[in-house]
């Protein structure tokens, strides 16, 4: 398994089992959920919780919306899962950011446009959007968060 910041690719297995990875809760020190990461699969997360500053009670993250020139607001994290294919690790990085930057009502369409089938979006209002296929893969550790999941197709 190779971990570079918010991106992980599985190379081989953990003994006879796939690697199990955690998805960071954007506002708590623990994982919000885990999932199995089989060999060749890659997972990438973009979020507002690693590199940011706060000014007058507002959080400003390092991801800039190119349409406005300002840091993205309204979303805490986006996690994508990419199936085995050439450059899966790179795709896990470059596909999470456009979904993160998209307007809330356009996130599912952006994922579909980029052919991302497995994604998880944690909005700032604690609403959680997840593709049906991603929902099936997740083992929720934060049961309160699980109650806020809205499945998208």
Please provide the spans of the model-predicted regions.
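Mature catalytic core of soluble alpha/beta enzymes
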Residues: 1-153
């Amino acid at each position: 398994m190779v971990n570079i910041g918010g991106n992980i690719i599985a190379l081989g297995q953990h003994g006879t089992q796939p690697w199990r990875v955690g998805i960071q809760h954007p506002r708590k020190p623990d994982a919000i959920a885990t999932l199995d990461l089989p060999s060749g699969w890659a997972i990438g997360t973009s979020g507002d919780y690693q590199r940011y500053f706060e000014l007058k009670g507002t959080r400003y993250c390092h991801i800039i919306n190119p349409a406005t020139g300002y840091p993205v607001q309204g979303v805490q994290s986006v996690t994508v899962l990419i199936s085995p294919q050439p450059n899966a690790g790179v795709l896990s990085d470059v596909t999470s950011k456009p979904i993160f930057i998209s307007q809330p009502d356009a996130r599912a369409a952006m994922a579909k446009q980029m052919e991302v089938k497995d994604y998880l979006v944690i909005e700032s209002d604690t609403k959680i959007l997840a593709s049906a296929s991603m929902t099936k893969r997740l083992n929720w550790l934060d049961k309160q968060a699980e109650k806020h999941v809205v499945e998208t197709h």
